[in-house]
């Protein structure tokens, strides 16, 4: 079975591999980081390799993703899909958890846990000056040794919270989608819907959606819809 990541990435790679897939404006820095389709796929491949080859994730397994609005969240989402996993936004017994240090205490301590950096440049936690607690894995550090290409073992039937990829698709989200907000707890399902629809995303954090700067970003990035 074809993986959800292949379904998402193949047409984008065929159309224009250098086109932007995920753009992240952090107005608190301020910073702007943009990953092309190819760069996003490279991150996804490394994360898929980590999940399958080191953590034993197989098609149909569940990976819990509790992640903020950040460009690397796109890589985690697609990486899990490439490994054949279904993503859950709620804890599932014995499932691998991918989260950030500030959300670690919200999850069971007795499961395999990967911590995602929120550094603008994607630096591993220690390099960014963030302490890595014992018993958890620094995602950015651990995935670096894996290739930036991935050959999947197979796909799973479900993509997100019990829904198949096709069930997430929405033709209105097939363009450039603006996702603004001071703190978005729905970014994983939002990105899943955008990618399932063939769209790309512009994340804006650190600013209220009503901030005039957000409207300027929307105009600059030529977004077509706001979520």
Named regions from a protein language model:
Residues 66-70, 181-184:
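Conserved AMP-binding
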Residues 41-64, 160-178:
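ANL superfamily AMP-binding
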Residues 1-18, 212-216, 220-227:
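Actinobacteria-biased recognition of intrinsically disordered, low-complexity terminal regions
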Residues 86-108, 121-130, 165-176, 208-227:
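Conserved ATP-dependent adenylate/AMP-binding module captured primarily in the ANL superfamily
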Residues 50-55, 79-81, 85:
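Short N-terminal edge-element motif at the start of the domain
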Residues 29-30, 34-35, 50-52, 74:
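N-terminal pre-catalytic "stem/leader" segment of glycosyltransferase-like enzymes
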Residues 79-83, 187-202:
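Conserved short alpha-helical elements in the N-terminal third of ANL/AMP-binding
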Residues 11-35, 135-161:
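AMP-dependent adenylate-forming
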């Amino acid at each position: 079975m074809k993986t959800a990541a292949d379904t998402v990435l193949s047409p984008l790679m065929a159309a224009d591999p250098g086109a932007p897939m995920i753009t992240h404006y952090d107005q608190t820095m301020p910073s702007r980081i943009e990953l092309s389709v190819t760069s996003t796929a490279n991150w996804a491949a490394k994360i898929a390799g980590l999940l399958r080859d080191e953590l034993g994730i197989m098609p149909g397994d569940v990976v819990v993703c509790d992640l903020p609005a950040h460009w690397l969240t796109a890589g985690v989402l697609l990486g899990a899909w490439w490994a054949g996993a279904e993503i859950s936004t709620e804890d599932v017994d014995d499932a691998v958890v991918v989260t950030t240090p500030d959300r670690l205490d919200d999850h069971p301590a007795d499961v395999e846990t990967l911590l995602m950096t929120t550094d603008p440049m994607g630096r591993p936690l220690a390099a960014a000056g963030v302490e890595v607690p014992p018993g958890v894995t620094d995602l950015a550090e651990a995935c670096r040794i894996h290739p930036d290409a991935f050959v999947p073992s197979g796909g799973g039937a479900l993509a997100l919270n019990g829904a198949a990829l096709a069930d997430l698709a929405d033709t209105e989200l097939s363009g450039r989608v603006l996702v603004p907000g001071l703190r978005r707890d729905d970014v994983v399902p939002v990105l899943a819907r955008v990618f399932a629809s063939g769209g790309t995303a512009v994340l804006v954090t650190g600013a209220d959606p009503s901030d005039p700067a957000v409207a300027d970003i929307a105009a600059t990035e030529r977004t077509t819809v706001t979520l």
